[in-house]
Every structure is written in structure tokens, then in C-alpha cells.
Amino acid sequence: MDQLTDRPAEDARTRIQAKNRETILAAGREVFARHGLRGATLDEIASTAGMSKPNMLYYFRRKTDLYRAVLEEVLTDWLLPLDALDPEGDPIEELRRYISAKIKLSYEHPQASRLFAGEMLAGAPHIETYLSGELKEIVDRKARTISRWVSEGRLAPIDPYHLIFAIWAMTQHYADFDVQIRALLGKQTGKPGFQEQAAQAVLTILLKGVTPR
């Protein structure tokens, strides 16, 4: 009887812990994107998360542990649309969905892109194993899918890795260089439809380049 009584309480604690962890990761993403690993402090992250520092340390004992968890969460979010490429689907439509999803991520989570860019510029010391492991595995698998589409004549001849790199570069530009874009385009960036206009430009450039002629 005690076990049945304890289970709802344990489930509630699990939900609270999951929610707290999610809150800490979101706060870490914001603060790390603003200050980098060196400039960020656990005090500021805890304040942003709306909890005490000791409470936060229950979930992440070191700043580097939290930083690594934030980066891995970012990469997981980014890899989901790539991993969703269906080898049996229409190549152009599959790429259209992927590119659109990447642009949406850049607009909705620009801090994540800037945080990742900072880690790359530093030589990726905290996620090098992740990059050469899980990331490489997914990219290699999807590169084989793109190569198959090319060999079947369903895509124009293109190196699959460089296509993936080009998609990353063009979509993440809108997050990494947001300040430059706003400086050059001014009020245009705040007008309704600007995001859709940017997405369509990227889609047109990339998809016309891989459409069989």
C-alpha cells in the first residue's frame, strides 16, 4: 500500500525535476550566449532561472557541466530535422522541409546558434567528442541518402557534405549575424513577412542548385 501511495509523489518529484532542469538549461543558453563560458557566472544563470544557486547546483555541479549540457541540447534540436530526411521521399521536398526547419530554428532560437558559433571559434573543446561521434554518424548517414538521390538522377550532381555545409551556413547566418542584417536592412527586418521572404530566398538559391536539369 505504501508503494502505491508513494508513486504519485515520486512522479510529481520527477516532473518538478524535469521542469527545473529545463528552466536551468534555458537560462544557461541565454547567459552563455551573451557572455560565453568564461564570462558567464553561475549566480547570473541561477538568477535568470529564478532559483537559488544551491538549488541549481543540485542539477549541475559545475559550470562546464551545464555548458556542455546546453550545447548538446542545441545540437540535438538541430539534428532532429536533418535526421528526419526520408530516403524514400521526394528529394526536393525533403530538402525544402529541412531548410525551412533550420531557418525557423535560427529565428526562434538565435541564442543557440550564437552559442554554438562561439564554441566552434574556440576549437570546440567541450563537444569535440560529440561532433566526431553522434554528429558525424548522422551526417554520414544523410550524406549517403543525398548521394543515392544524385545517383538515381533525382538531384543534380552535388557533393552531399558541401550541400549540408551550405545549408548550415545560409540558415544560421540569420542568427549569427542578426546585428549586421538589421544594420544593413533597417526597418525591413521588423516588417511582417520578412522571415518568410528570407526563407524563400534561401530555398530558391539552394533548391534551384540541386534540382535536376
Task: Give the ranges of each region predicted by the language model.
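C-terminal peripheral helix-coil segments that are non-catalytic and often amphipathic
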Residues: M1-P8, K104, E108, K136, ...
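Amphipathic alpha-helical linker/stalk segments
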Residues: R68-R97, V139-S147
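Short, structured helix-loop boundary elements
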Residues: R21-E22, L42, T64, R68, ...
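Helix-turn-helix
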Residues: T23, A27, V31-D65, A69
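Short acidic/histidine-centered micro-motifs embedded in hydrophobic/aromatic stretches
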Residues: L115-E119, G133, A166, M170
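Amphipathic alpha-helical segments used for helix-helix packing
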Residues: Y107-T129, F177-L185
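Hydrophobic/aromatic residues within well-ordered alpha-helical segments
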Residues: N20, K63, V70, V74, ...
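Hydrophobic alpha-helical connector segments
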Residues: D83-R114, E152, P160-I167, E196-A199
